[in-house]
Amino acid sequence: MGLFTPKKPPLIGVDISSTAVKLLQLSQAGGRYRVEHYAVEPLPPNAVVEKNIVEIDAVGEAIRRALARSGSKLRHASAAVAGSAVITRIVPMSADLSDDDLEGQIQVEANQYIPYPIDEVSLDFEVLGPVRDNPEMSNVLLAASRTENVDMRVAALDLGGLSARVVDVEAFAMENAFAMLADQLNVGRDALVAVVDIGATMTTLSVLRNQRTIYSREQVFGGKQLTDEIMRRYGLSYEEAGRAKRKGGLPESYETEALEPFKESLIQQISRLLQFFFAGSEYSKVDQVVLAGGCASIEGLGAMLEEQLGVPCVVANPLARMSLSPRVQAQALAQDAPALMIAVGLALRSFD
């Protein structure tokens, strides 16, 4: 199973996160995309831990429920493995190799770049373009993941009634979805855009330049910290705390006791991720921050981050320019939109 090889027929994008399964199906007409079907189905606690599937039956059942609720009739899907489960390298290769020869050469040379036995990994590659100052060579992006990581995604989809046609890398799916945001941002050519995806247990920083990912890093921190604090402080179950976090109903003291400290901790984590990027690169600032993920819409977070970093900050909506099928609930979709970046990137693989 290739990690990011485009395949036909049409695909439904399936993002398996630590707390939910997100399904999205798009169509395209006249150069414009339309949301045909979507669903978000919660996962039981610890079914997926730090993006690794632990309880495959529970994940498969959640996919099955989400598929039924979405109303989609597609049975071919694209999913993704987390960046932490993938090794990527940019490797120079002769530009005159055919795809078959290039694939053979990569299989031969992969041992140099992959720290696992080659028969235990799934490999894929993408030609990025000529090497600067040496047009006889091409830069080739090599991606590899332990086969077990890929197989778990494939098996979960199968249990949910879907056939995996593409297993992508989350960072590449994020890059794919970023194309839907690019014209919403007031940044020039060569600007650095930091996309911060704040999930339940992981926060991922992707830095893009001219819509290409130049850096990606994950940090174990996310919305579950706030859910755990609500459980501890107010004596609620995991499900009750998650519901209260989304819909309200907590005591007035919640904002000062739990929410504000969480926002401050989250901003510290984001600042730390950016410092890692600056320390290992030629850059010392970014030009724009885009907040994505389930925590992106926390009231006041963007303004606090903008003040802390001195950089414009917006909340991602990769669906803003898309039309909606009548069967899609617009209000629910708008609320979920910042958390659908990876699902959008995966659904867009239908049109590669």
Regions found by a protein language model. Give the residues of each.
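Conserved phosphate-binding/catalytic loops in two-lobed NTP-binding clefts
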Residues: 303-343
